[in-house]
């Protein structure tokens, strides 16, 4: 649907509660009851849905504008405004959902029935009581703001406000340092410093969960987790089982990767990495949440001379060189010592950010998609503004369901953002493909689809593709596949257990299986069980480490990212097949294939108008989540990891 969609490591929302629902806050037609004393008819149901779609579309535009302002100018005032709008919006959506149940037992065309069902399962988990609803809306705004304004001030004692002018670091700056530092003590300080932002959220979050569950029960669900899992054209229990089955398929590959990486970290750091319980210290993996490990490739790269001769392309250097060469105005952004807050420095950063986005747009254009509208370039946020606080987590926006597509990012020129740009544009091209559908069908087939589109494109960022762009001098031989695959797996495979653990923790919090008194203990039990990672220092219930991950305080479901990591390989294989590619899956790029683009566009245009199983089958030939394409992709690496680990075990 309309609104914002966020990327994994910088986050999500397919139509958040705030956006879905401000929708109805002041709609004239919804202000009037459609109650009818007689039995409902199909004509009544159609009239209801027609009104709902029209009003939701009109009001969604206003909501999207409000949400955009709140996230691109974080102040107490924008927080307060968002809280009020959320409260009004949620109240009206709950009323609309309640009205829709009038048609529950009515026989009607499948298309109409599906729209009513989607309205019901996307209802926000919010209490009907106005006072409780107001409290929930205020808490939601506070938690989002606490994360968005989070800082680590190295010279400030824990629990104290920083002095004026103190040198404080936001999550982007911290993440950059963590990606590059190889000092275990520095990494521990940064990890502990950022995770300290969670503790003040703890009580607010516990109350927020209580209020959400009240709303979920009023909608007929046991808890909010069950409500979240109900939106997948299967029962909540079936959805949980589908995810668990996929993890069981993938776990052997992950365990081999974990074993290999742990051994290399011990070789690098010694006792700092060698825990007797076999866990990897989370701060050593190059990412604040240990969710993606690609930043430590230099530590774990193959040492076999036959493989070590193949060095991963320094894409960051290649991008900076090419961008500066094509647009000299961007060059100062890459010059050491440039003040990026100056007019010249900021203009250079903006030019570099726009150039990064053009790479992604050009890939979609090569598949036959139309260029992005002029307003996209005028209204998007590509870099961090100089004059205000913003939420830097990358997100894609469909503000008016016509042509007002945007992204909100704080782009840096590096390999990670190169991939993130492709990911976010996948959302925007998806938005545009289904914008001719009724409002309630304007969504991905499920939320995992939305996250997977751009990433399936990014899998085509192969050495051959980079060579085509002039970012690589030549295409490496097949012997180079293992190093390249290892670099990819450090992100894509390592991410899966983190995504699973995060939402399993949250589902158990919603269900009451995890009590507030055990929030942090349970968090680390799940992280250890699925990821095999542990915190760098002892943690207690005075801490709230889940709050240091954006998706928890902003209440964004995370299962979509687990799904997306698998769907992207299913989509990728389907488009490779459509392009006529023959050869190892991991070496395919369907850049410039109009046949692949047509297959992709057909899937995007369906939106949520049919069960995702049907859309998936039309795209891939199978109607279920399938890890096999991912396993096929990483087959060379899996064989090599098993060989390496077996040899190490014999030493």
Give the label of every model feature segment.
Residues 405-421:
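Short pre-active-site segment immediately N-terminal to the catalytic Zn-binding motif
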Residues 166-172, 207-408, 477-478, 482-488, ...:
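Active-site-proximal, well-structured secondary-structure segments within enzyme catalytic domains
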Residues 4-16:
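Bacterial N-terminal signal peptides that target proteins for export
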């Amino acid at each position: 649907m309309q609104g914002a969609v966020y990327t994994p490591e910088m986050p999500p929302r397919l139509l958040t509660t705030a956006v879905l629902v401000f929708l109805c806050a002041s709609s004239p037609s919804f202000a009037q009851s459609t109650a009818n004393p007689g039995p409902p008819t199909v004509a009544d149901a159609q009239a209801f849905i027609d009104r709902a779609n029209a009003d939701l579309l009109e009001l969604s535009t206003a909501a999207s504008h409000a949400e955009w302002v709140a996230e691109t100018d974080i102040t107490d005032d924008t927080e307060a405004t968002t809280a009020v709008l959320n409260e009004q919006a949620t109240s009206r959506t709950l009323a609309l959902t309640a009205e829709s149940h009038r048609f529950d037992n009515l026989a009607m065309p499948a298309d109409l029935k599906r729209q009513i069902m989607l309205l019901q399962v996307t209802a926000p988990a919010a209490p009907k009581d106005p006072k409780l609803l107001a409290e929930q809306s205020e808490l939601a705004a506070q938690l989002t703001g606490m994360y968005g304004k989070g800082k680590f001030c190295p010279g400030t004692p824990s629990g104290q406000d920083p002095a004026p002018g103190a040198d404080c670091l936001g999550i982007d700056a911290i993440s950059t340092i963590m990606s590059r530092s190889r000092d275990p003590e520095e990494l521990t300080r940064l990890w502990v410093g950022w995770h300290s932002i969670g503790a003040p959220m703890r009580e607010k979050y516990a109350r927020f969960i209580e209020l959400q569950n009240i709303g979920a029960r009023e909608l007929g669900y046991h808890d909010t987790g069950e409500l979240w899992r109900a939106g997948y054209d299967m029962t909540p229990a079936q959805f949980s089982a589908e995810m668990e089955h996929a993890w069981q398929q993938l776990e052997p590959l992950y365990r081999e990767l974990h074993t290999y990486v742990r051994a290399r970290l011990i070789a690098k750091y010694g006792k700092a990495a060698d825990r007797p319980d076999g866990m990897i210290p989370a701060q050593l993996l190059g990412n604040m949440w240990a969710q993606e490990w690609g930043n430590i490739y230099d530590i774990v790269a193959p040492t076999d001379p036959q493989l070590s001769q193949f060095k991963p392309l320094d894409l960051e250097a290649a991008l900076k060189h090419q961008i500066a060469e094509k647009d000299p105005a961007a060059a100062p952004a890459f010059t050491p010592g440039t003040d990026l807050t100056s007019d010249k420095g900021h203009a250079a950063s903006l030019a570099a950010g726009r150039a990064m986005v053009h790479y992604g747009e050009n890939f979609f254009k090569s598949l036959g998609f139309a260029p992005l509208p002029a307003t996209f370039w005028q209204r998007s946020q590509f870099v961090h503004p100089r004059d205000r606080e913003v939420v830097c987590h990358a997100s894609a926006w469909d503000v008016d369901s016509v042509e007002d597509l945007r992204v909100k990012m704080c782009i840096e020129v590096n390999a990670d953002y190169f991939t993130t740009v492709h990911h976010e544009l996948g959302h925007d091209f998806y938005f545009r493909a289904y914008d001719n559908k009724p409002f309630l069908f304007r969504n991905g087939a499920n939320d995992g689809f939305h996250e997977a589109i751009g990433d399936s494109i990014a899998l085509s960022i192969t050495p051959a593709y980079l060579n085509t762009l002039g970012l690589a001098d030549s295409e490496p031989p097949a012997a180079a596949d293992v190093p390249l695959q290892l670099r990819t797996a450090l992100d894509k495979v390592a991410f899966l257990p983190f995504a699973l653990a995060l939402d399993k923790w949250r589902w158990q919090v919603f269900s009451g299986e995890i009590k507030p008194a055990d929030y942090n203990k349970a968090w680390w039990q799940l992280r250890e069980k699925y990821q095999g990672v542990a915190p760098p220092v002892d943690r207690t219930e005075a801490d709230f480490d889940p709050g240091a991950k954006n998706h928890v305080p902003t209440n964004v479901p995370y299962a979509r990212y687990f799904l997306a990591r698998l769907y992207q390989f299913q989509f990728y294989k389907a488009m490779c097949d459509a392009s006529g590619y023959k050869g190892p899956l991991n070496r395919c790029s369907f850049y410039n294939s109009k046949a692949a683009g047509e297959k992709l566009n057909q899937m995007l245009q369906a939106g949520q108008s049919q069960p995702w199983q049907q859309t998936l089958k039309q795209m891939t030939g199978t109607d279920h989540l399938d890890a096999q394409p991912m396993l096929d992709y990483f087959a060379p690496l899996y064989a090599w990891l098993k060989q390496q680990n077996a040899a190490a075990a014999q030493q």
